[in-house]
């Protein structure tokens, strides 16, 4: 069954949201060292540039579906796209850290509005099951391609010489894309029907955002400030308040009032194990890019462009593996995921061997990143399927939103813990690796331990095949 030109136009326009979100999630990883040098930022400042983007996005995910039903999916998609475009302009014109952080937070919040509505509009536009499946496949492919493009542009754009402070291009490039997409969606995408569903209060999401910031803030600032007493008190207080908040939401659900979460989901053992596996895995995922980008540029004297190209090989390995694994998983189930985790662990240990020299061979680096990408591509696409596969159909949408929220928050924890270890560890050699810094060695070791935890959780899942 073929798509008409107008079908491809709709898919392209409604995939622009996820394209821009993923681009800006990955483009920043390679360009962070350049931004840090240009704006004279501290180590914790660079962590906030990523974390505020992710928390802003995650804070709206759970309520996004309900908001789209009440206010209109097209309307929220346009508001999110416009907000993302304006925030990108703010980031590109930033003259100080606080202006950049404000822009990144608004980028994240805007993404939380537009990304869920984009995929919801695609499912509404294509009633035919075969066309819908093909459209969602294209949507997913665009997100995967965006991650590779983001890494490449994050390396190439900061090295441009025809403009001063060329790192600004990584944000300014979004402005024409977002502006054209807004106009085209307004003109060509049909308006969806608004349901009579009552809007949920956004206060629980605001409360959740504040509590998460209360947990993340001391984890980021504590190591840099030598853990003053206030940071420890804030962390303990935030954890206690977070537990009380969850208990309050559970009590509301039992009384029949709207709740932030559907707690019946957590009666499913497979879902719980899948969430824990995702929590550990995604702590490693984004931290890997940030650490290796920083290490290659600041310790091994790679340019941003060379670093971006190296990460393209990781992306190619990921894409190729994910295509092959989608077929193998149906026959071999969780064994494929465990095999992928083994490749990732072996890849991380190989980093310590290959990087143990002052003069890196680019071909070895490319092969190493490609190998690690194969491991990622064997694991990541199946994790969500593993977590959701035993849920009743009526709970899959809610379970997906919770899974995606945990995914984003796990990335924040990875940046706080693993990247924090890398940035704040004193520079000495790592045991008998004379040309590996202790910071890189300990961060890599922590990543390996977390991946071993993922493998342990996966082995606890039932052995039936994934459908």
Say what each PLM segment does.
Residues 38-40, 72, 93-99, 301, ...:
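Helix-breaking motifs and short loop linkers at transmembrane-helix boundaries and internal kinks
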Residues 35-36, 67-68, 153-162, 219, ...:
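Interfacial helix-cap and linker-helix signal at transmembrane-aqueous boundaries
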Residues 51-65, 112-120, 312-324:
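Central cavity-lining transmembrane alpha-helices of secondary-active solute carriers
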Residues 61-72, 158, 321-335:
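Helix-to-loop junctions at the C-terminal end of transmembrane segments
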Residues 160-276, 309-310:
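Hydrophobic transmembrane-helix bundles of small-molecule transporters
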Residues 9-23, 28-30, 256-428, 438-464:
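12-transmembrane solute porter fold
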Residues 74-203:
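Helix-loop-helix hairpins in multi-pass membrane proteins, especially solute transporters
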Residues 31-59, 99:
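Extracellular/periplasmic helix-loop-helix junction of adjacent transmembrane segments
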């Amino acid at each position: 069954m073929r798509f008409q030109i107008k079908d491809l136009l709709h898919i392209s326009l409604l995939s622009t949201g996820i394209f821009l979100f993923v681009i800006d999630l990955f483009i920043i990883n390679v360009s962070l060292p350049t931004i840090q040098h240009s704006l004279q930022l501290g180590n914790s400042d660079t962590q906030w540039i990523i974390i505020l983007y992710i928390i802003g996005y995650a804070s709206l995910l759970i309520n996004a579906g309900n908001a789209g039903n009440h206010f209109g999916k097209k309307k929220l998609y346009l508001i999110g796209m416009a907000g993302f475009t304006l925030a990108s302009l703010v980031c590109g014109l930033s003259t100080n850290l606080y202006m950049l952080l404000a822009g990144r937070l608004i980028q994240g919040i805007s993404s939380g509005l537009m990304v869920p509505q984009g995929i919801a509009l695609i499912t509404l536009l294509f009633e035919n099951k075969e066309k819908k499946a093909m459209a969602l496949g294209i949507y997913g492919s665009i997100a995967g391609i965006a991650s590779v493009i983001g890494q490449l542009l994050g390396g190439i754009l900061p090295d441009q010489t025809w403009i001063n402070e060329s790192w600004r291009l990584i944000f300014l490039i979004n402005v024409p894309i977002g502006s054209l997409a807004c106009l085209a969606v307004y003109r060509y995408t049909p308006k969806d029907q608004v349901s009579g569903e009552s809007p949920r209060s956004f206060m629980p999401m605001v409360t959740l955002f504040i509590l998460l910031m209360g947990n993340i803030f001391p984890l980021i600032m504590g190591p840099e400030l030598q853990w003053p007493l206030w940071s420890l008190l804030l962390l303990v207080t935030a954890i206690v308040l977070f537990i009380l908040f969850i208990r309050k939401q559970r009590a509301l659900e039992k009384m029949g009032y709207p709740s932030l979460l559907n707690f019946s989901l957590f009666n499913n053992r497979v879902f719980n194990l899948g969430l824990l596996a995702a929590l550990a895995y995604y702590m490693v995922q984004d931290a890997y890019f940030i650490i290796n980008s920083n290490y290659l540029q600041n310790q091994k004297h790679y340019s941003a462009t060379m670093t971006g190209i190296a990460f393209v090989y990781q992306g190619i390995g990921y894409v190729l593996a994910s295509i092959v694994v989608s077929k193998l998983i149906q026959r071999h189930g969780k064994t494929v995921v465990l095999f992928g985790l083994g490749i990732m662990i072996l890849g991380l240990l190989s980093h310590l061997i290959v990087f143990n020299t002052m003069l890196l061979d680019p071909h070895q680096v490319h092969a190493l990143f490609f190998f690690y990408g194969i491991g990622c591509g064997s694991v990541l696409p199946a994790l969500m399927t593993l977590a959701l596969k035993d849920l009743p159909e009526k709970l899959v949408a809610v379970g997906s939103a919770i899974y995606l929220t945990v995914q984003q928050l796990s990335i924040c924890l990875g940046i706080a813990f693993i990247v924090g270890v890398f940035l704040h560890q004193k520079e000495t050699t790592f045991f008998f690796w004379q040309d590996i810094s202790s910071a890189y060695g300990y961060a890599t070791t922590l990543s390996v331990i977390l991946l071993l935890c993922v493998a342990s959780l996966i082995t606890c899942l039932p052995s039936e095949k994934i459908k």
